[in-house]
UniProtKB/Swiss-Prot annotation:
This is Thioredoxin, mitochondrial. The modification N6-acetyllysine is found at K152. Monomer. PANTHER family: THIOREDOXIN, MITOCHONDRIAL. Its main location: mitochondrion. The record marks D84 as: Deprotonates C-terminal active site Cys. The lineage of its organism: Eukaryota, Metazoa, Chordata, Craniata, Vertebrata. It comes from the Eukaryota. Gene3D superfamilies: Glutaredoxin. Pfam families: Thioredoxin. GO terms for cellular component: mitochondrion; nucleolus.
Length: 166
């Protein structure tokens, strides 16, 4: 109890009375925040670093952990899967990855996205004949039905996803 009082007094003396603006407002929007409480007349907001994102991207995108995980979540999936073979050092991958995640999220669960780092999962990259990154595969019922290499704009990605969903 004493710790809460001390924390409340400290926060009262440190935190400004203005609501978050600018960069902080954008960081706290679209997040699940803990309840606000009143400390000496001030409304205390949680730190943006302690918020939980609840965007659809988190629900439709996953990182492949190993070969059996790929088999279970991609090959055996009843939902069509877009597989993004990428690398940490790849510049175009850093552009395509978020763009592709956004487009997959817009499909509302009709397709999911698996991300495979080729440096961590060389065996999968070899098995699926990935010779350059980014390489994106469309897998439906365990079979590769489409593929592209390189960066694409949003219109091309949308057409790629629509073709996969059918």
């Amino acid at each position: 109890m004493a710790q809460r009082l001390l924390l409340g007094r400290f926060l009262t003396s440190v935190i400004s009375r203005k609501p978050p603006q600018g960069v902080w407002a954008s960081l706290t929007s679209k997040t699940l925040q803990t309840p606000q409480y009143n400390a000496g007349g001030l409304t205390v907001m949680p730190s943006p670093a302690r918020t939980v994102h609840t965007t659809r991207v988190c629900l439709t995108t996953f990182n492949v952990q190993d070969g059996p995980d790929f088999q279970d979540r991609v090959v055996n999936s009843e939902t069509p899967v877009v597989v993004d073979f990428h690398a940490q050092w790849c510049g175009p991958c850093k552009i395509l990855g978020p763009r592709l995640e956004k487009m997959v999220a817009k499909q509302h669960g009709k397709v999911v996205m698996a991300k495979v780092d080729i440096d961590d999962h060389t065996d999968l990259a070899i098995e699926y004949e990935v010779s350059a990154v980014p390489t994106v595969l469309a897998i439906k019922n365990g079979d590769v039905v489409d593929k592209f290499v390189g960066i694409k704009d949003e219109d091309q990605l949308e057409a790629f996803l629509k073709k996969l969903i059918g």
